[in-house]
Amino acid sequence: MKIAVLSRNPRLYSTRRLVEAGEQRGHEVVVIDTLRAYMNIASHKPQIHYRGKPLEGFDAVIPRIGASVTFYGCAVLRQFEMQGVFPLNESVAIARSRDKLRALQLLSRRGVGLPVTGFAHSPDDIPDLIRMVNGAPLVIKVLEGTQGIGVVLCETEKAAESVIEAFMGLKQDIMVQEYIKEAGGADIRCFVVGDKVIAAMKRQAKPGEFRSNLHRGGSASLIKITPEERMTAIRAAKVMGLNVAGVDILRSNHGPLVMEVNSSPGLAGIEETTGKDVAGLIIQYLEKNGGPHLTRTKGKG
């Protein structure tokens, strides 16, 4: 197969591993800088150009699209889909999961367990919003944030009111979530490929911190997940329409709660912690399931 990897940086661990795994299995793998690919949209034959030449002959595309380039990255991926190239994750599914609010609404509609979450526009509604999520302590999240940036834990209702007001004053869209104390600053990252959880790790926040992101100094360890957690992760990825996803789950007193479904999960933490060849399993998934013109939405999304 000829596989394109959409990535801003060929030196990133995840990108390097996908190239290695693809080449080891006899495929040609080309890394394409997402922002340097440009499109001829209004032609009978949809084209993508890169450094002055059309990109042609690809069988599959692996999108590693950073949150900051979601809009442009999805447009490039859609163009590949219109050419009949098989995407590891579809543009529609990526856009869906990147909109945190929409993602939670879809998960909620399908009965997937979530922390109680509130969303409001007017400062007048702040007191009721806080009551809605069972009061303080509570977590405030900026909708555009990644890697734990723009996430605040408010210990008191007074602090919560001040922080929510400040964000609203800055015209920042935020959501307010109940704080799951019993999770103890830990979450579980389930790595879903197809309809299986192929690897899982526990991420523990460093002392004095509540965000367990590895980018924020959290530590990772092996964990055995329960059948219910496994089912929840697989369902969450399915609701989003993602073939490959990192599903972040909290252990609460009333079962597993999904915090986020990540469409471009990093491979470094999960491979180092579990010792599994996650990149190889992703390439195997493409070999089994890839093929021309198999995009469910046919790039119309």
UniProtKB/Swiss-Prot annotation:
Domain called ATP-grasp: residue spans: 104-287
Official protein name in the record: Probable alpha-L-glutamate ligase
Binding locations of ATP: K141, E178, Y179, D187, R211, S212, N213
Cofactor(s) essential for the protein: Mg(2+); Mn(2+)
Amino-acid positions noted as binding Mg(2+) 1 in the UniProt annotation, renumbered to this chain: D248, E260
SUPFAM superfamilies membership: Glutathione synthetase ATP-binding domain-like (SSF56059)
Organism from which the protein derives: Stutzerimonas stutzeri (strain A1501) (Pseudomonas stutzeri)
Enzyme's top EC category: ligase
Example of a GO MF term: metal ion binding
Gene Ontology CC terms: cytoplasm
Chain residues that bind Mn(2+) 1: D248, E260
Pfam families listed in its UniProt record: RimK, Rimk_N
PANTHER family (alphabetical): RIBOSOMAL PROTEIN BS6--L-GLUTAMATE LIGASE (PTHR21621:SF7), RIBOSOMAL PROTEIN S6 MODIFICATION PROTEIN (PTHR21621)
Similarity annotation: Belongs to the RimK family.
Gene Ontology BP terms: protein modification process; SOS response; translation
Cofactor note: Binds 2 magnesium or manganese ions per subunit.
Extent of the signal sequence: none
Entry annotated with the keyword Protein biosynthesis: yes
Binding site for Mg(2+) 2: E260, N262
Keywords, comma-separated and alphabetical: ATP-binding, Ligase, Magnesium, Manganese, Metal-binding, Nucleotide-binding, Protein biosynthesis
Known EC number: 6.3.2.-
Record: residues binding Mn(2+) 2: E260, N262
InterPro entries reported for this sequence: ATP-grasp, ATP-grasp_RimK-type, ATP_grasp_subdomain_1, RimK, Rimk_N, Rp_bS6_RimK/Lys_biosynth_LsyX
